[in-house]
Amino acid sequence: GIFVIFREEADANDYLIRNRRRRSISVKISRADRIYDEHRETIDELVEFFTQRGRLPRRDESIDLQHRLRDAVGGLRRAWNVVRNVTEGTDWEAITAARCDDLLVDLALLKLNRRPNFMALPEATRHDIKEFFGSYKQATAEADQLLFSSGNTELVDETADAATVGKRLPTALYVHESALGGLAPVLRV
């Protein structure tokens, strides 16, 4: 066997303690976290765009941001993958669904005041419609269906009963203006 002899008892104890200790575990920072930390401001602009629009920018939108993302990360898709890896707990699909619902409510309410043609809408809204519905015709059809479903009193009552915001009375649902976004689309119409 191997014998180790020390002159001082403290050195022997130090040796024994060091040999029984687990090897130090190095903390590995994921590549996505490193990229995010290095380019936080630029990537945060992408996150802000997505939370406002519910989608990634198209090629002809936010061109400056896309150029900066290409220089920093390598492109829009790669930057989005970094965002998804860094923000694992965020439900991005819920943000997209909420923006889609907002757009449906807006289109349904525009029907009441003569809905404009597609080219009369703001460019960002046209991009949203193409992204979420594929065509203006499909979007207006779904908006009309939402508008007509708001006339179904049973559906409105069931939805009002299930509402998580506001005060429900037997014949009414009172909701503060700041909480309207938390209502189902059929109640917002």
Model-predicted regions and their roles:
Residues 1-4, 9-189:
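Functional cation/ligand-contacting sites centered on basic and imidazole/sulfhydryl donors
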